[in-house]
């Protein structure tokens, strides 16, 4: 018996990084996973794994999300992962950067939750997990102005949904990682003028001396998706190797 046997789980940004690791971990524990991403070619790599079904989805497009929600008969867990990390202070953040980050990191979760929550309410049960970050209202981080702002908003959204719908059988939590070794992180390091120095800077702030792995974060997500965490709601759950201490 898997820890997620019989559960239907929808997640976004499943083609790589934490989303991919979570999709695989959910399926391994017996869930029926509907993995979505905008990147069709990378997403298709998940089709070979038992228990995982894929669907191309742009989480910034309301029409696509509403159609997707209409196609899903039942849903136990919604895991909102999609997001973007902008590098810079407020002076480096143009209005286009601000709008893009808000749209992908916050509005997409609003759209997904609003589309799928009525289905959960009709079932009188549901579990929503949002991807936030330690770089948020939890910790001020250099050069993460708009990113931290969006992730603080995710914590606020999470607490609001949890408070509003707890009596309807709905739980809502968010995962707050520190620095995780993902393709996104490696791309950001390589984009810096001195990648070697950037890597060193990232590692220096890790009290454990290493990054988290996507698989470690995925194991926390399995716990939050399972009935083992049934008494947990409205919480930003930190997994950061002590970075926020």
From Swiss-Prot:
Substrate binds at residues 144, 188, 205. The active site is at 147 (proton acceptor). Its EC number is 1.1.1.-, 1.1.1.30, 1.1.1.104. It catalyses: cis-4-hydroxy-L-proline + NAD(+) = 4-oxo-L-proline + NADH + H(+); (R)-3-hydroxybutanoate + NAD(+) = acetoacetate + NADH + H(+). One of its GO terms (molecular function) is 3-hydroxybutyrate dehydrogenase activity. NAD(+) binds at residues 16-18, 37, 58, 151, 180-184. InterPro entries: NAD(P)-bd_dom_sf, Sc_DH/Rdtase_CS, SDR_fam, SDR_superfamily_enzyme. One of its GO terms (cellular component) is cytoplasm. Belongs to the short-chain dehydrogenases/reductases (SDR) family. Homotetramer. NAD(H)-dependent dehydrogenase/reductase with a preference for cyclic substrates. Catalyzes stereoselective conversion of 4-oxo-L-proline to cis-4-hydroxy-L-proline, likely a detoxification mechanism for ketoprolines. Mediates the formation of 2,5-dihydroxybenzoate (2,5-DHBA), a siderophore that chelates free cytoplasmic iron and associates with LCN2, thereby regulating iron transport and homeostasis while protecting cells against free radical-induced oxidative stress. This is Dehydrogenase/reductase SDR family member 6.
């Amino acid at each position: 018996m898997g820890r997620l046997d019989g559960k239907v789980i929808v997640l976004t940004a499943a083609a790589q990084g934490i989303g991919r690791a979570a999709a695989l971990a959910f399926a391994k524990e017996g869930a029926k996973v509907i993995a979505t991403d905008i990147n069709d070619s990378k997403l298709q790599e998940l089709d070979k794994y038992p228990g995982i079904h894929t669907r191309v989805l742009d989480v910034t497009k309301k029409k696509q999300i509403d159609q997707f929600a209409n196609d899903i008969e039942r849903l136990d867990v919604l895991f909102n992962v999609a997001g973007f990390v902008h590098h810079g202070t407020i002076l480096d953040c143009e209005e286009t950067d601000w709008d893009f980050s808000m749209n992908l990191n916050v509005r997409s979760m609003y759209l997904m939750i609003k589309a799928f929550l009525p289905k959960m309410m009709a079932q009188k049960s549901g579990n929503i997990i949002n991807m936030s970050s330690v770089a948020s209202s939890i910790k001020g981080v250099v050069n993460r102005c708009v990113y931290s702002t969006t992730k603080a908003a995710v914590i606020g959204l999470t607490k609001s949904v949890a408070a509003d719908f707890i009596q309807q059988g709905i739980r809502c939590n968010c995962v707050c990682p520190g620095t995780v070794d993902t393709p996104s992180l490696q791309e950001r390091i390589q984009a810096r003028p001195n990648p070697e120095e950037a890597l060193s800077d990232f590692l220096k702030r890790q009290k454990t001396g290493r990054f988290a792995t996507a698989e470690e974060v995925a194991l926390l997500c399995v716990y939050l998706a399972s009935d083992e965490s049934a008494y947990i709601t409205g919480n930003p759950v930190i997994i950061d190797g002590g970075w926020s201490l």
